[in-house]
Design a protein with these regions (language model features):
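Glycine-rich, acidic loop regions that bind phosphate or pyrophosphate groups
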Residues: 3-9, 130-171, 271-375, 551
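Phosphate/pyrophosphate-binding active-site segments
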Residues: 4-31, 166, 325-420, 544-545, ...
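Glycine-rich, anion-gripping cofactor-binding loops and their flanking helix/strand elements
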Residues: 93, 243-329, 432-462, 477-478, ...
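Thiamine diphosphate
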Residues: 62-135, 141-144, 293, 297-303, 308-312, 338-341, 347-349, 353-357, ...
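Conformationally flexible catalytic loops at phosphate/diphosphate-handling active centers
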Residues: 24, 174, 178-233, 384-387, ...
Length: 589
C-alpha cells in the first residue's frame, strides 16, 4: 500500500463509514420495495383474501389490467359491466365474501350503477373499482371522465377517490371493512389512471381508524329483559324473518328458537331459507304474493318479532294497518330502519345472531298457545299456493318449479331474474337453508338472473345452480351465457317463456282495464339457436306431457343448459295483496 493510500484510509471515520454503508443498503432495499400502484392494489386485494375479480377492461384501468396479467387473482371477463356487478352480487350472496368489480371510467363506471344500487338495497358487500382519468385531467371534461363520487354517494356505504398512491393500502383495507361490517353494502373506489403507474414503497395496512363509524352488534341487557317480558305475555306469536337472518347466518339459531317456543314463522322474499321449507312452523313468504297462512298470521298475531326485515312496502303495503293487534319488536343491525316504516313497541339495535344467541341461552317459559299454532297450520293446509287450472296446451310454471325442487331435493342454489317467475320460484321451491336463494329484492332488477347465477356457481362449484328467468329479463343480459362454457360452469337456466312482460301485463289486466300497452312481444328470437350459438345445450319444452321427462334429461346433462318452458301468456301470480291494501285483503285465493 502506498503512503498516500495509507494516509487516506487512516483519515476515514469508521462510524461514518458504517452509517454510509447502512444508508446505501437502506436505499437499495427501498428501491427493491418500490412497486407500482397497480401492484400495491393487487397485494392489498390478496391480503383481503380476494379469489375472483369480475370486470371489463378499458383505457383508464389498463395499468391495473396489465398487473392482472400475472394471474394472481382469477379474473372473470363479463360481456357487459352490468353483468360483472350482478355476478359479483351472486358471488357475495352465496360465498358470504366480498364481491369485487373492476371497470373502466366513464361509461364503464356508469354501467355498474344499477348493480351498485341493487347491492345497496339488498345489503350485499361489494367493493367496486371504477377507473378514472389521470389526476391532472379530473374536472376538465377529459375523455371518458365521469363524476363517480357524486353519482355513487347516495347508493354506497362509502366511496373513495385515490389521490395519493401511498393511500392505496389504507383505502382498500377500510373499504373491505366498511362493506362487511354492520349492515353490509357496496363501497366504490375511484382509481385515477396515474395512480396505477406511480411508484411507492408503502407497506400494506392492518389498522382501521374511521372516526364516527361504529357498529353495534350486542343487544343491551335491558332490551333482552323487556323482550322476554313481552314473550311471556303473548298468546299469538309470530316471527318475521328477513334477510338479516340469512346475512348473519343465524338460521340454525332461529330454528332452535322457534321450535323451542313453538312460534309460527313467516319470511320475507329475501328471508327465504331462514327456516327449512318442511318445518311445520314455517308458514311461507308474507306480503304481496305471500301465502294465505303467512298474511293471516301477520294480521292476527298479538306479538310480532321482526328479525332483520325492513318492513318494505311489498310486505306491508298499508303500514298503518299492519299487524293491527300486535305489539311489535324489531331487531336490526341498522338503527335507521327502526321506526322508519312501522312504529314499534321495542326496537333493538343488534346483530340477529347475537340476539338469538342471548335468547337461546335463557330459560323462558311462554304461555300455552297450541291452539294458535294449530290455527296457523290449518290455514297453511287449507290454503296452499295454487298450481292453477290444468292446461292441455301450455306447461304450468308452478308445476315446473315444484318438479325441479324434487329433482334437486330442495338443495340447489336458486337464482332468479325479476317478474312472475321470481314469485313462482319463491312460492314453490322448497328451500332448506340460507345461501340457496339469490334474487333482486329491493330494487327488482331485470337482467339480474343469468349473471348472478355465474357468481353463485363460482362461489359454490359443487352445488347445483338453477337460474329461473323470464323471456323479458333473459334478453337484457343473455350475453353472459358465453361465460358458462368459457369457465366450465354447469348452470341450468330455466327460461319461463310467456311471450310477454308477465308481471306488467298482469297489473295491466287487473288495474288498467286490460289495456296491454307494450307488454307483449310481437316477435321473439329462437332461444334454442341462441343457446347453440353460445355453446350451451338447449332443451325446448312446449307440451305439458313432455315436462317431467325433458326436465329429467336436462338436469342429467353434464354441462350448462338452457331449458325453455313455454307457458300461457295469461298465467298469473296468486294470491295478491293489491298495493295499499292490508295483508288479509288477498285476492285470487
Amino acid at each position: 500500500m502506498s503512503k498516500t493510500q495509507h494516509e487516506v484510509n487512516q483519515n476515514i471515520d469508521p462510524l461514518k463509514m458504517a452509517e454510509s454503508l447502512e444508508l446505501e443498503q437502506l436505499n437499495e432495499k427501498t428501491l427493491n420495495d418500490m412497486r407500482s400502484g397497480s401492484e400495491v392494489l393487487v397485494e392489498a386485494l390478496l391480503k383481503e383474501n380476494v379469489d375472483y375479480l369480475f370486470g371489463y377492461p378499458g383505457g383508464a384501468v389498463l395499468p391495473l389490467y396489465d398487473t392482472f396479467y400475472d394471474g394472481k387473482i382469477k379474473h372473470i371477463l363479463a360481456r357487459h359491466e352490468q353483468g360483472a356487478v350482478h355476478a359479483a352480487e351472486g358471488y357475495a350472496r352465496v360465498s358470504g365474501k366480498t364481491g369485487v368489480v373492476v371497470v373502466t371510467s366513464g361509461p364503464g363506471a356508469t354501467n355498474v350503477m344499477t348493480g351498485i344500487t341493487d347491492a345497496h338495497c339488498d345489503s350485499l358487500p361489494l367493493v367496486v373499482f371504477t377507473g378514472q382519468v389521470a389526476t391532472p385531467g379530473i374536472g376538465k371534461d377529459a375523455f371518458q371522465e365521469a363524476d363517480i363520487l357524486s353519482m355513487t354517494s347516495p347508493i354506497t356505504k362509502q366511496n373513495y377517490q385515490v389521490k395519493r398512491v401511498e393511500d392505496i393500502p389504507k383505502i382498500v383495507h377500510e373499504a373491505f371493512h366498511v362493506a362487511n361490517s354492520g349492515r353490509k353494502g357496496p363501497v366504490v373506489i375511484d382509481f385515477p389512471k396515474d395512480m396505477g403507474v406511480l411508484a411507492t414503497n408503502v407497506d400494506l395496512c392492518d389498522e382501521i381508524n374511521i372516526p364516527g363509524y361504529e357498529v353495534v352488534t350486542e343487544p343491551e341487557n335491558k332490551d333482552i329483559d323487556t323482550f322476554i317480558s313481552l314473550l311471556k305475555e303473548a298468546k299469538k306469536l309470530v316471527v318475521l324473518a328477513g334477510a338479516g337472518i340469512n346475512q348473519s347466518k343465524s338460521n340454525q339459531l332461529l330454528t332452535q328458537f322457534v321450535n323451542k317456543h313453538q312460534i309460527p314463522t313467516v319470511t320475507t322474499l329475501l328471508g327465504l331459507g331462514a327456516v327449512p321449507y318442511e318445518d311445520t312452523l314455517f308458514l311461507g313468504m308474507g306480503g304481496m304474493h305471500g301465502s294465505y297462512a303467512s298474511n293471516m298470521a301477520l294480521t292476527e298475531c298479538d306479538l310480532l318479532i321482526n328479525l332483520g326485515s325492513r318492513f318494505d312496502d311489498r310486505l306491508a303495503s298499508k303500514p298503518d294497518a299492519f299487524a293491527p293487534n300486535a305489539k311489535i319488536v324489531h331487531v336490526d343491525i341498522d338503527p335507521s330502519e327502526i321506526n322508519k316504516v312501522i312504529h314499534v313497541d321495542l326496537g333493538i339495535i343488534a346483530d340477529c345472531k347475537r340476539f338469538l344467541e342471548c335468547l337461546n341461552d335463557k330459560n323462558v317459559e311462554t304461555i300455552e298457545h297450541s291452539d294458535w299454532v294449530k290455527h296457523c297450520q290449518n290455514n297453511k293446509q287449507k290454503h296452499p299456493f295454487k298450481l292453477g287450472e290444468e292446461d292441455q296446451v301450455f306447461c304450468k310454471p308452478q308445476q315446473t318449479i315444484e318438479y325441479i325442487g324434487k329433482i334437486t331435493n330442495g338443495e340447489a342454489i336458486v337464482t332468479t331474474d325479476v317478474g312472475q317467475h321470481q314469485m313462482w320460484a319463491a312460492q314453490f321451491y322448497p328451500f332448506k337453508n340460507h345461501g340457496q336463494w339469490v334474487t333482486s329484492g329491493g330494487l327488482g332488477t331485470m337482467g339480474f338472473g343469468i349473471p348472478s347465477s355465474i357468481g353463485a356457481k363460482l362461489a359454490n362449484p359443487d352445488k347445483t345452480v338453477v337460474c329461473f328467468v323470464g323471456d323479458g329479463g333473459f334478453q337484457m343480459t343473455n350475453q353472459e351465457m358465453a361465460l358458462l362454457p368459457e369457465y366450465g360452469l354447469d348452470v341450468k337456466i330455466v327460461l319461463i317463456n310467456n311471450g310477454t312482460l308477465g308481471m306488467v301485463k298482469q297489473w295491466q289486466d287487473k288495474f288498467f282495464n286490460q289495456r296491454f300497452s307494450h307488454s307483449v312481444f310481437n316477435g321473439q328470437p329462437d332461444f334454442m339457436k341462441m343457446a347453440e350459438a353460445y355453446g350451451v345445450k338447449g332443451f325446448l319444452i312446449d307440451k305439458p306431457e313432455q315436462l317431467e321427462e325433458q326436465l329429467d334429461a336436462a338436469f342429467a346433462y353434464q354441462g350448462p343448459a338452457l331449458i325453455e318452458v313455454r307457458i300461457s301468456p295469461t298465467e298469473a301470480v296468486t294470491p295478491m295483496v293489491p298495493s295499499g291494501k292490508s295483508n288479509h285483503e288477498m285476492e285470487g285465493l
